[in-house]
Every structure is written in structure tokens, then in C-alpha cells.
Amino acid sequence: MEIPILLDQFYLTFGIEKYATWRPEKAPHAIICGATGSGKTYFTKLLLGKIALYAENCEIVVCDFKNDDDYIFLDGCKHFYRYMECQRGLETFYQAFQSRQSGEDKTRNMKVLLFEEWASYLNSIDKKEQDNEKRKLSNLLMLSRSFNMQVIICVQRADAQYFSTARDNANLIVGLGNLSDESRSMLFSSYRSEMLPDRKQGTGYMLTSGTNLTAVQVPTISNMEKLHKVVREAVNR
């Protein structure tokens, strides 16, 4: 499955809309990084909509630790968790993973976990709980692809301390806006010298499986209500 997710800026300079694509089965799991105002959440909602459209019977779990109005359209949905409910959301997804791993669940429709503001969530709980939550995330990043499960983590900074040893298992990296030197080094280490400091809101860089650095632009969502509808359906499954 190949999902068109971002516009390639090189082609846009010639007036050509060519999409950079993501193949989750080949490059599992994603980290989306960007400061406040970079367009990170706008892109994340677009990505969820694309997944819901392209992956038949996809089930999405959304953990929104920010608890602002960005995901208010999901209020009342079966697998929507806000603020401290996010702990239950992660556990729900982790149990679904364990059910597939143990053979209890034989289904293989795509299941997706989106966790907004993972680092802020970890900083809100005590050390013992942090270690337990990071262990779950590490297991998901390392093992869940085989069971058609994907993890999408949104952060302002992708410090290794928030991912235990499994950050490199996220194969789709999207950095929006002008990332700090530290974030470029952490996520785009081999290409940081090629990243220009001219990124505006909704523009950035994409890396797939550690290669093919691409300057990208987030497409405009032409029908927000349609996007909300397909995402709601997936979060309610």
C-alpha cells in the first residue's frame, strides 16, 4: 500500500504536484516533529485521513495529551483518549498488539496508534510509570509491524530519552518548520547539512528508512468535514 502524504517541493517549483509517498509495510512507524505553529497537527490529521481512506477497515486509536480543540471532532468516539486518559489509550492499543502476537486475534486489518505530545505525556508521570510506558512503546516500535500495526508519534523534540532504545525503528520521519540543531542531529543526522533554514509553516523535510531526504509541503485539506468523517469512522471501529 502506497499512501501519498506530502507534496515534493522540488517539483512544486516547476508547478507540478508530485506526492512523496509512504509505504507503511516497508517503512513502518512515524515520528512527526515540529515546534508549535509548524503545521504538525494539521499534517497529522491529514495523515490519519489518508490512512483511513487507503487502509480498508483501518482502526485508529488517538491519544491527544494536549487536550486542546484540534481533535474536538473526535469527542465521543470509541478510541479517542484525552489528557490523562492517554495512559488507558496506550494500554488498549498494547493489549490489541499482545492479542495478535499471542495468536488470540487472527485478524490483520491495519491498527494505528497516534500519540500527540508523547514527551509532554511522559514528563507528567513518575519515573516508574515512564519506564513502563516507554517499554510498551519500544515493543510496539520493534515488533508490531509484523501484525499490521503502526505507531505515529508527534513531538516538539524527539530526544532519545523519550523512546528508550527504539527510536530508530520509526522509519518515516517528518520534520516541519525550522528544526533546532539538536532535532536535526537526532532525526536527520546524515543530512542535517543539506537542510536549509528557510522552512515556513507547513513545509519541512521527510526521510524514509534513513534515506531519500525530500523537501516537502503539506497539501491543503480541501474538504475538512470529509476528512473528519473518515477519521471518526476509523476511531469508532
Residue ranges and their predicted role:
Residues 1-112, 119-178, 188, 196-197, ...:
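P-loop NTPase catalytic phosphate-binding loop
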Residues 118, 206-209:
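AAA+ P-loop ATPase catalytic core
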Residues 180-184:
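Short gly/pro/ser/thr-enriched loop/turn and capping motifs at secondary-structure boundaries
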Residues 192-206:
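Conserved C-terminal "switch" segment of AAA+ ATPases
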Residues 211-215:
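Short, mixed charged/polar active-site loops
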Residues 220, 224:
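Short, charged phosphate-coordinating catalytic segments
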